[in-house]
C-alpha cells in the first residue's frame, strides 16, 4: 500500500505519527474476523479505513493492492438444457458433484436439476430488479436465476460496472463471479423457442454467444480462469 495508507491520520490526537504499524494490526484483526474475505474486499476496507483516519478527506494518494494465496474458489454456472434430453441426468450429476458454488440460469435448467435430483424448486415472488424475473431456490444451489435476460444483464454490468445501490439477480451473479477464481460454464445447446422472436432486441443473442462475451470480459478485464463446456 502507498504511504497515503500508512500516514493516514497523521497529526491527529490518536495517531500523531500516522496509522503506521496500526495498518498491520487492522489487517490481522480483519482476517481473524473474516477469514474468507476476498482480496478485493480487504483492499477496499483498508482504503476506507485510511479515509476515515483522515476525516474522510484524503491528504495523499491512497492505494492498496492485496494478493490472497489460497485454494481457488470454484464457481459452476449452468444455463440452458442439453441438446439431447438423454444428457439431462449427466448435467444433474455434474451439478451435484461439483466442488464449489453452483448457479443455475434458466427455468428449464432449474427444472431439469430439480427433476433429476428430486429436489423441490421454490420460486420467490420478491421482485428486486424490475428488468428481471425473481430468484428461485433449491437445496444445494447457491443461486437460481432466469436465463438469457439475466446473462445479458450480467454482461452489461461487467462491461459498464455495477451502479451504486442497485440490486437484483444479475447483481447477485456478478458478485459471485467476482469472488470466484475459476468459473466453469456448462452451456446447453437446445434452442429455447421463447427467444426465436425476430422482434427481440439484438442484445438477446443465443445463449452461447452471450456466455462467450462474458468469458472474454472475465479473462481480459477481471483475470479469471474461465472454461466453457457445451452440452
Where are these regions (language model features)?
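Helix-loop-helix
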Residues: 21-48
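Catalytic core of PPM/PP2C metal-dependent serine/threonine phosphatase domains
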Residues: 39-67
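Conserved beta-strand-loop-short alpha-helix elements that form
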Residues: 1-16, 67, 105-109, 187-188
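Non-transmembrane, aqueous-exposed alpha-helical and coiled segments at domain scale
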Residues: 71-101, 110, 114-231
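Glycine-rich, phosphate-binding/catalytic loops in enzymes
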Residues: 16-20, 120-122
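Membrane-interacting alpha-helical segments
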Residues: 8-15, 32-37, 74-85
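Short conserved micro-motifs on helix faces and helix-strand junctions that flank
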Residues: 58, 103-105
Amino acid at each position: 500500500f502507498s504511504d497515503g495508507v500508512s500516514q493516514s491520520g497523521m497529526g491527529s490526537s490518536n495517531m500523531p505519527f500516522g496509522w503506521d504499524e496500526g495498518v498491520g494490526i487492522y489487517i490481522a484483526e480483519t482476517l481473524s474476523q473474516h477469514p474468507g474475505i476476498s482480496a478485493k474486499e480487504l483492499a477496499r476496507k483498508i482504503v476506507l479505513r485510511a479515509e476515515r483516519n483522515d476525516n474522510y478527506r484524503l491528504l495523499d494518494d491512497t492505494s492498496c493492492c492485496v494478493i490472497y494465496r489460497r485454494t481457488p474458489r470454484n464457481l459452476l454456472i449452468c444455463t440452458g438444457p442439453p441438446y439431447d434430453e438423454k444428457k439431462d441426468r449427466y448435467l444433474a450429476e455434474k451439478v451435484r458433484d461439483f466442488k464449489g458454488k453452483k448457479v443455475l440460469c434458466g427455468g428449464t435448467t432449474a427444472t431439469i436439476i430439480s427433476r433429476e435430483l428430486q429436489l423441490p424448486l421454490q420460486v420467490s415472488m420478491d421482485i428486486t430488479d424490475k428488468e428481471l424475473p425473481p430468484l428461485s431456490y433449491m437445496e444445494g444451489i447457491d443461486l437460481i436465476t432466469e436465463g438469457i435476460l439475466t446473462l445479458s444483464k450480467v454482461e452489461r454490468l461487467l462491461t459498464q460496472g455495477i451502479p451504486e445501490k442497485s440490486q437484483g439477480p444479475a447483481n447477485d451473479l456478478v458478485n459471485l463471479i467476482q469472488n470466484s477464481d475459476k468459473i466453469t460454464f456448462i452451456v446447453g445447446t437446445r434452442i429455447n423457442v421463447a427467444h426465436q422472436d425476430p422482434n427481440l432486441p439484438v442484445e438477446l443473442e443465443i445463449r452461447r454467444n452471450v456466455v462467450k462475451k462474458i468469458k472474454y470480459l472475465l479473462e481480459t478485464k477481471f483475470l479469471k480462469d474461465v472454461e466453457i463446456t457445451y452440452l
